[in-house]
Amino acid sequence: MSTPAAGREEVSRAAEPSRSRWTALAFIAVAQLMIALDATIVSIALPSAQAALGASDADRQWVVTAYTLSFGGLLLLGGRIADFAGRKRAFLLGLAGFAVASMIGGAAPSFAVLVVARALQGAFAALLAPTALSLLAVTFTQPRERATAFAVYGSIAGSGAAIGLLLGGVLTQYLTWRWCLYVNLPVAIVAAVGGWIVLPGSGARVRARLDLPGVALATAGLVALVYACTEAVSSGWSSATVIGLLTTSFVTLALFVFREARTAHPLLPLRILADRNRGGAYIVVALVIAGMFGAFLFLTYYLQTVLHYTPLQAGLAFLPLSVASQAGSWLIASSLMPHVAPRALMAPGALVAAAGMALLTQLQPAGAYLLLVLPAEVLLGLGISCVMVPAFSTATQRVDPRESGVASATVNAASQVGGSLGTALLNTVAVSAAAGFAGAQAAAFVHGFSVATAWGAVILVLAALVATVLISAGRPQPHRPI
């Protein structure tokens, strides 16, 4: 049994400067980069995988959908497992499972095996993603150190998708689509070996029963919501399937909240959501991802379908966004976070990103990469990084360390739901606008893209408004390290 003196000794050790914490940050970042890359790297390889495995056009979406459903649906469970089992154990288990799933997918002899492997990847990503963020939240508690650590995390979140497109293009064009999955193996091994050596012990763990009814309700509600958004892209929001899924999601999530408010050992303690600053950060993350993700997808299609870029060229075309995201994370967010209130970064950042979206509304079928796409990517990269770095920090700040896993899972779930909703909503807007446009196919597509991007800009402005109104936290103050 631990004593108060032992507890003080543990805190004292944690407060001592330790190089191993920064080494640990490097391996946590490697793991997070693997997850971020996987969001887009397989999308580039999908046409080649479809042809090689003989999948139909109707079935190919399941390579993406299987990952999205398991990732989004299991995040809260994954975060709570980290709290129960310990962060180091959960981190290593997530890496091992993700690597095995990637190996199965890379060697898949059939399309069905590939889909199952992608579902397994999503399940282990749902364990790994909140665990990685939780490790950052409890390891780096002083304002300057926290700003640096979350700048690393934010730069990966902002540029990982773009890097995934580039890497996917290189691997598909010069090797084979299977390497878009195999590439995770060496990355996971490096992160796992490093994590095993330098990560601290699992620390305080929750000594309580797992809320199995809460797990079932949360998983069913999130899966139904994410699947409804996915299905709406092809079937429309008025289809019976989508309406049924949305109804199921609403009912099960309402029952989940009812359950969590009354059980002694909730899966998601509602006090985590009730905090004004954390709740505001969750909403901002969801809105920013919703506004950005749909337009990000459309821009990929624009470059390859309208401008006829190869997958590799399209990946290279996204490099400015990645560079700008790194610059925004390190030169702006990391420097200013210890000195200003979170909303002083988040609101202007969202407005800068909205300006980048507004530029994209001016695209033409003839193309204007240097005049429009390039500056838009720079604005998007700078703006998004200045939102995400303080948002992720605020969403996990001052949380009981025994609940840091589920708190980290909640902000990841907000990101996942935001991406799914944004893609579905903006796709609906784009299709409707293109259908009502009298002109050539390319012109109609670009018109639909422009209208959808305008809506994306509006969503980003709304994110700036939410950050200004809801997030009232002041300048970061030092607090006791965990």
What do these predicted ranges mean?
Residues 3, 133, 185-204, 219-231, ...:
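C-terminal membrane-cytosol helix-exit motif in multi-pass small-molecule transporters
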Residues 58-62, 112-120, 175-183, 209-211, ...:
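Interfacial loop-to-helix junctions that mark the boundaries of transmembrane helices
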Residues 21-37, 42-44, 57, 63, ...:
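12-transmembrane solute porter fold
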